[in-house]
């Protein structure tokens, strides 16, 4: 039996909430909270006939730590699942620490304002020291490890599929299947067809920033950065067929390099159709990728 507060009600959050409601013996009570409560109410109404999980809803601005703290205190959950935007990771982690509640998310922190001078100074220092220029990295959240440990709390970071299940697969392989692991290649393939010329599978802003950024991979103990989409491979996926895939920077490379230090090379590839790439480049050419006003 558990009470879970789920912050977020977008595409990824909706899938996670549906899956939680399929195991009501584990997730006995869920509160769905978002900036727009009407979205939470609609999802709760859809789920009500399908599950015995008790579902309530709430409004919260996850950018404001005091609002998150107030909601946690009111609902008293065992776990907060942060499936909002990665911009809000630190705010929600701070609220969990203040309230003594366990934390879980699906994507590591990146700032909403990448021009903030204080953040920029830390970022540029990390770029020089680490060797990759992605806006997102684990350093901000890993810095919370001691705080959560001293509070007797658990914080699970990147607990989606990739990152998340991918690291679990690698850890299982290391423990049970191999004496040592030399190389890791993660291949992310979407075999679906929604019929649209262009659409993202999760938050468009985050997706487009991730794909249009320089790629990078881990090799021989250091990062190698490359121009965006400059390494392409063709791969035939079981039950899906041949797809074009491109090397991207992805957060699990960072955690795998830390936890499987013997790996000589770690890479991440994702499949994209030509129509998606054409639309993305068009948006990029007119300055519509990024947070700057046009």
Show which residues each predicted segment covers.
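Glycine-rich Rossmann-fold phosphate-binding loop(s) that bind the pyrophosphate
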Residues: 9-10
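Helix N-cap at the beta1-alpha1 junction of Rossmann-like dinucleotide-binding domains, i.e.
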Residues: 36-39
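Conserved Rossmann-fold cofactor-binding substructure of NAD(P)-dependent oxidoreductases
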Residues: 60-77, 84, 88
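Rossmann-fold cofactor-recognition segment
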Residues: 50-64
């Amino acid at each position: 039996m558990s009470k879970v507060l789920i912050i977020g009600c977008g595409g990824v959050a909706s899938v996670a909430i549906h899956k939680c409601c399929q195991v009501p013996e584990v997730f006995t009570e869920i509160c769905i909270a978002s900036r727009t409560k009407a979205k939470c109410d609609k999802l709760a109404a859809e789920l009500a006939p399908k599950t015995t999980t008790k579902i309530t809803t709430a409004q919260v601005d996850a950018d404001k730590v005091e609002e998150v703290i107030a909601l946690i205190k009111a609902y008293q959950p065992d776990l907060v699942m942060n499936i909002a935007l990665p911009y809000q990771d630190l705010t929600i982690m701070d609220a969990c620490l203040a309230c003594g509640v366990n934390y879980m998310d699906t994507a590591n922190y990146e700032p909403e304002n990448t021009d903030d001078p204080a953040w920029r100074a830390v970022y540029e220092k990390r770029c020089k020291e680490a060797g990759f220029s992605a806006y997102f990295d684990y350093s901000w959240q890993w810095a919370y490890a001691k705080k959560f440990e001293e509070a007797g709390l658990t914080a699970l970071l990147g607990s989606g599929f990739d990152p998340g299940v991918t690291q679990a697969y690698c850890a299982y392989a290391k423990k049970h299947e191999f004496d040592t692991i030399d190389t890791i290649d993660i291949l992310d393939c979407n075999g679906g067809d929604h019929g649209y010329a262009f659409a993202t599978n999760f938050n468009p802003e985050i997706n487009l920033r991730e794909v249009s950024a320089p790629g990078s991979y881990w090799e021989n103990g250091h990062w190698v950065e490359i121009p965006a989409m400059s390494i392409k491979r063709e791969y035939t996926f079981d039950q899906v067929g041949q797809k074009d895939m491109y090397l991207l920077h992805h957060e699990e490379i960072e955690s795998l390099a830390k936890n499987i230090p013997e790996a000589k090379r770690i890479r991440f590839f994702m499949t994209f159709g030509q129509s998606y790439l054409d639309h993305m480049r068009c948006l990029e050419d007119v300055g519509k990728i990024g947070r700057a006003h046009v």
